[in-house]
From Swiss-Prot:
Lineage, top ranks: Bacteria, Bacillati, Bacillota, Clostridia, Peptostreptococcales
Composition skew (Basic and acidic residues), residue ranges: 1-14
Summary of subunit composition and partner proteins: Part of the 50S ribosomal subunit.
Official protein name in the record: Large ribosomal subunit protein uL15
Family to which this protein belongs: Belongs to the universal ribosomal protein uL15 family.
Biological processes annotated in GO: translation
Biased composition (Gly residues): 23-35, 42-52
MF terms (GO), sorted A to Z: rRNA binding; structural constituent of ribosome
Gene this protein is translated from: rplO
Transmembrane segments: none
Length: 147
């Protein structure tokens, strides 16, 4: 026997069922769509959230809150992300963007959070620092400069 002579075992391969091709196929007449109605039609179906005319959940629940247009928006970066830089580097928002740590600089700048550990001695320039972030930067021999 050669590779080109290989065939599946007898009866192992079945033809796929073609819908709507006569009752003998097992999927004729209604083609698996049940009786007539909206869901039996071409393009039939209801939009997400539609509950058959009953007041939908998203309209039964009250609106809540608002967006404060004066809110401060920072890029929040955990301190362990700064281990990517070499010792003695001055870490700025522009450098973080160039290296791909952040995608874009938010309107209020960078905030350094203290999650994780810092093994490098860096000078970090940012708009805000948490207390734990300042402690960890200084413990590693670096400086935290508030812009």
């Amino acid at each position: 026997m050669k590779l080109h002579e290989l065939r599946p075992a007898e009866g192992a391969v079945r033809d796929r069922k073609r819908k709507g091709r006569g009752t003998a196929s097992g999927l004729g007449k209604t083609a698996g769509r049940g009786s007539n109605g909206q869901k039996a039609r071409s393009g039939g179906g209801v939009r997400p959230g539609f509950e058959g005319g009953q007041m939908p959940l998203y309209r039964r629940l009250p609106k809540r809150g608002f967006t404060n247009i004066f809110a401060n928006v920072y890029n929040e970066i955990n301190i362990d992300r700064l281990n990517a830089f070499e010792n003695g580097t001055v870490v700025t928002a522009e450098l973080l963007k160039e290296t791909g740590v952040i995608k874009k600089i938010e309107k209020d700048g960078i905030k350094i959070l203290g999650n994780g550990n810092l093994e490098k001695s860096l000078t970090v320039q940012a708009q805000k620092f948490t207390k734990s972030a300042i402690e960890k930067i200084e413990a590693a021999g670096g400086k935290a400069e508030v812009m």
